[in-house]
Swiss-Prot record:
Family recorded in the similarity comment: Belongs to the adhesin P1 family.
Protein name: Putative adhesin P1-like protein MPN_286
Biased composition (Polar residues): 38-48, 145-156
Basic and acidic residues bias locations: 135-144
Signal peptide limits: none
Listed Low complexity bias regions: 21-37, 111-131, 157-167
Lineage: superkingdom: Bacteria
Region (Disordered): 9-48, 59-78, 93-167
Length: 465
């Protein structure tokens, strides 16, 4: 079964076994500041289970008699050990079990985490299924091996949090969406998409320690006003990450925006007058985030969803095939390769235009910065030696970042393919606060199954998205 949703992490694993290692002497961020560790053993970008998913121990073989249920309002979970059920919503609950198996386990009840079933309110008992605002706090008391879990709204033993964004309601059908019994379930497709795009925020463990105070309510920041004084506290959907680290790679480099614009060749667009005069129009898929402006207190990190309401009509046709997962989003087919069992530092994304008459129809390949050994610090990509790359002229004055010759493309049916002399360029001229960073690329993949549009006459490079 799909037991976790991988996403760009910061070296800390949550529910998977992948942990990257950066052999550089610098460039890894810790609580928003560049590490000065010279030992060369800092963790590199890898995958963390910070989204939506489900983990559980398999209780018996499929089709066996060991079938359990979580209650009358929750669907049955064949072969799953309910005592070890770990539900991951990313926005209010996770089960971080200590390695010793004794202390610090989050015993938040299933109904409290999902909003399913009957829960009390000031006006009496009401059904709050699918309403995150109605989730109850749970208090855990331990005496030896005995654990008592009770709902509470105050105290020192809270295991989930009140100060979550009030406007996030991923789906009104949490139990069905989380059951994973129907791989084409529309609600589950919504949860996948929201998790993968980072629209479900995560809780910040600022200390990085696994103790009773690992999640402080004061560290969960959602407003731009709170962000302005210290960006390391940001936990808005566009930047959701664990351990207080800011990871804007999703938006800054791999951001998907509905904005249309133009490229003037290698020199970029806008204020640059030294590039080619040949202007090429580019279009971007209508999913992604708009960065908050640094000079506006009212600016927010906004989810861009033009014409999309996250309904079954907009997000559907979810198909799991081998290690790949794909679903339809508007006019795009979104495919995540190596999704179910991702290797360290790799998760491929293809965006394929579904309109055969679209002259810009193409497949785009996405991969996290672990591939080219970049790390991130407050919106700036850092090279293996901690140097800033891309936005300020790049390494050695170049306006692009050249990947190692060992950069690999992976195709599920054909194995590994080497793409020689690949170059991802980050245009310094086009970067400005408050706007999604363009993906300026001279990518020339040799594999014919990874098509990119040919450059026009006089066009030195092109924005892909």
């Amino acid at each position: 079964m799909l037991d976790y949703i991988p996403w760009i992490g910061n070296g800390h694993r949550y529910g998977n076994d992948h942990r990257g290692s950066n052999s550089s002497t610098s460039g890894v961020t810790t609580q928003g500041q560049q590490s000065q560790n010279a030992s060369g053993t800092e963790p590199a970008s890898t995958f963390s289970n910070v989204g939506v998913g489900l983990k559980a121990n398999v209780q018996g073989t499929l089709g066996g008699s060991q079938t359990t249920t979580t209650g009358k309002d929750i669907p049955k979970w064949p072969t799953l050990d309910q005592a070890n059920l770990q539900l991951w919503t990313g926005a209010g609950w996770r089960n971080d079990k200590a390695s010793s198996g004794q202390s610090d386990e989050n015993h938040t009840k299933f109904t409290s985490a999902t909003g399913s079933g009957q829960q009390g309110s000031s006006s009496g008992t009401t059904n709050s299924a699918g309403n995150p605002d109605s989730l109850k706090q749970d208090k855990v008391d331990k005496s030896g091996d005995s654990v008592t879990v009770a709902e509470t709204t105050s105290g020192d033993n809270l295991t989930n949090y009140t100060n979550l964004p009030p406007n996030l309601t991923p789906t009104a059908d949490w139990p069905n969406a989380l059951s994973f019994t129907n791989k084409n379930n529309a609600q589950r497709a919504q949860l996948f998409l929201r998790a993968l795009l980072g629209s479900i925020p995560v809780l910040v463990n600022k200390s990085g320690q696994d103790d009773s105070n690992k999640f402080q309510a004061t560290d969960q920041k959602w407003s731009y006003t709170e962000l302005k004084s210290d960006q390391t506290k940001l936990n808005l959907p566009a930047y959701g990450e664990v351990n207080g680290l800011l990871n804007p790679a999703l938006v800054e480099v791999y951001g998907l925006s509905s904005t249309q614009g133009s490229s003037t060749g290698a020199g970029g667009a806008g204020g640059n007058t030294g590039g080619d005069t040949n202007t090429q129009t580019y279009a971007r898929p209508g999913i992604g985030f708009k960065l908050p402006s640094t000079d506006s207190e009212s600016s927010k990190a906004t989810l861009i969803t033009p014409g999309l309401a996250w309904t079954a009509q907009d997000v559907g046709n979810l198909v799991v095939s081998g290690t790949s997962l794909s679903f339809q989003l508007g006019g795009w087919l979104v495919t995540f390769t190596d999704f179910i069992k991702p290797r360290s530092g790799y998760l491929g994304l293809q965006l394929t235009g579904l309109d055969a008459n679209d002259s810009d129809q193409r497949e785009l390949i996405w991969a996290p910065p672990a591939l080219n050994r970049l790390s991130w610090q407050l919106g700036q990509p850092l090279g293996p030696r901690g140097e800033c790359v891309g936005f300020q002229g790049g390494v050695g004055g170049s306006s692009s970042v050249r990947l190692a010759s060992s950069y690999k493309y992976h195709h599920r049916n054909e194995g590994y393919l080497i793409g020689a002399h690949q170059c991802f360029g980050l245009s310094g001229e086009l970067y400005r606060p408050g706007f999604v960073q363009g993906f300026h690329s001279k990518l020339r993949p040799k594999p014919k199954h990874l098509p990119l549009p040919a450059l026009g006459a006089g066009e030195k490079s092109r924005f892909l998205w």
